[in-house]
Amino acid sequence: MKSTLQESIDRQRNILKGWLATSLSLLAQDCKQAWPQRGALEARLIAGLAELPYCKYLYLLDANAQQITANASRAGLIESYYGRERSHRPYMAEALAGSPLSLSDAYISQNARRPSLTAVQVIHGDKGELLGYLGADFDLRELPATQALYQQPGQWLQLKGDPAIRAGLFH
């Protein structure tokens, strides 16, 4: 079962990464044109949420992974995130190492304590210099259902449970 589940997770990640690649690349190009005007960047992020229906938050970071915009959400801008230093967050590791588009492993978000994924798109200037990063956060609970990706094995399967619970059930 474990390999089947892992294969399903890998397929889901590849599908999500493929879906995000074009959308985030286009949004990053638009942001590059407005760089570094905060108001114009935040307006573009708010508009970008319409192009990413399952995205929870969009934000921009400078080349040092310091947040240069508020978080854009469907409810508007969340100012408290402006200036946040994100270089040490696990989802930044691939991007800081040079990956043009990275998709994090699942993690529990630091503030909202929700299961999350973060995609990070690198943004380069016209001369190839690193301007910064576009971050897109997703709540795993809000992503489309994945039943088609994972089929439960047809045979009955018993999983080992907590002995204390099992003892209480079968007496």
Model region roles, listed by residue range:
Residues M1-I68, L149-H171:
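Intrinsically disordered, low-complexity terminal regulatory regions
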Residues I68-T69, L131:
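Generic structural signal for well-ordered beta-strand positions
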Residues R74-A75, E79-G154:
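Sensory/regulatory domains in signal-transduction proteins
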